[in-house]
Amino acid sequence: MHMPDRLPAIAFLISALIFAACEKEITIKPNEGNDLIVVEGHIEPDLPPYVILTRSQTFFSETDITSLSHIFVQGATVMVSDGQRTVTLTELASNNLPASLLDSISRMIGLPLASVSNPGGLKAVIYTTSELTGQPGGRYTLSVEADEQHLSAVTTIPDRIVLDSVWTIPHPATDTLRTLMVRYTDPASEENYVRYFTSVNSRPFFPPYFTSVLDEKTYFNTSGKTVDIPLEKGYNRYDNDIDFSVYSYFAASDTIVLRWCSIDKDHFRFWSTAEFNRNSGGNPFSNPTHISSNIKGGLGIWGGYNPGYYIILPESD
């Protein structure tokens, strides 16, 4: 197993961002004419922070070019501090972004590339900087001023959780499908939280369709023992061709890359509650709901990742 070649930094992280401090649970009631701002921001070791700001009515909702015409918040002041210095992020528009990033955006929101890149299409906006990168163990404060609203959040980049091994096992009824397995030895007296993504045959990384996070209580509370965990295949949720009878399996011929990310508790709780609501058929930011967020003054997540990468090659004949 080894780390694959990296995609361009922005393109790599936006796969997690679009499909996508103090912890709090909030009840959201739609406010007509004054949408709350949703933060989708992340930082990881050796890469700069990336922040996408959208408006609450569209988060996790069905999308087309009309409903997304004003999804991105422009003209915001976005700052990140690592405790030593504070930097202001630069706003980048889709017409100034590389083709690799535009392709990632179109895949994540389920719209054709032409809808994102054409002059009359969607105007995507992302905030980033080359002046600051994440570090393991770092603590990062986000501050946003936009639409006469002030938002703030704090996240950390936990130590990396290293897997003992990664492999596949055959489907019980056919040798053309396989289940991805990981083995993990839990350090005693440590709380661990993970979000994972998979890439198949060099395609973009996607989280599992239903649940992308694993928590201390469910999987890792083993007091130093070793546990084997089956993982599900990642999907673009806007893919209309998913066969749910076998959705969790990989083809035996697939080359799989697992992106296994350590996250902190606040980050875990956001995805856990947001995915639960989404899987129940709701839109957590357009209907009254309980959802955990570390964003003060807004919605969404400012989260640190510490990823490890594992390659699983097809079974030899």
Describe the residue ranges of each PLM region:
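C-terminal motif of bacterial Sec signal peptides marking the signal peptidase cleavage site
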Residues: 18-21
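Bacterial N-terminal signal peptides that target proteins for export
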Residues: 2-10
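A sequence/structural signal for flexible, mid-protein segments enriched
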Residues: 23-317
